[in-house]
């Protein structure tokens, strides 16, 4: 095991231990939760190393980066999570690689995703903006 991979394994293990501790404190089991490893600005080779360490859920918040990485890593058993604001015009493309989209914030985006041809249904999570900051993503609570 390389030094960098050892460090990566140690960091992943520390995160998993923290999740297990928090789950226990909340009266839950860690295996009830899903760890989504976000690899923003890191190469696809890092995702490949993470899979070797047992990671299967990967998150990205930039469409182009997610699209490229998912295309490069089709040989791996991964679940791709899109966690960034998604432009309606890119929704159909995202639907081709994303297993889950965590930033649904408007009806037009739902319609665009619904019209995409996908082999597996996409898990969709509505993002709500609870702040007064219009620059933040998410639907208004009244919507």
Set out the residue ranges of the language-model regions.
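Conserved alpha/beta-domain cores
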Residues: 1-143
């Amino acid at each position: 095991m390389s030094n960098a991979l050892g460090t990566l394994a140690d960091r992943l293990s520390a995160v998993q231990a923290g999740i297990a501790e928090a789950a226990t404190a909340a009266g839950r089991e860690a295996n009830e939760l899903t760890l989504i490893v976000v690899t923003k600005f890191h190469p696809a080779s890092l995702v490949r190393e993470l899979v070797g360490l047992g990671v299967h859920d990967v998150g990205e918040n930039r469409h182009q980066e997610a699209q490229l990485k998912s295309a490069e890593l089709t040989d791996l058993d991964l679940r791709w999570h899109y966690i960034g604001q998604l432009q309606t015009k890119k929704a159909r493309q995202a639907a081709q690689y994303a297993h889950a989209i965590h930033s649904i914030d408007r009806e037009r985006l739902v319609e665009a995703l619904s019209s995409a041809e996908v082999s597996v249904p996409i898990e969709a999570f509505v993002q709500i903006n609870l702040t007064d900051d219009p620059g933040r993503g998410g639907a208004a609570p009244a919507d």
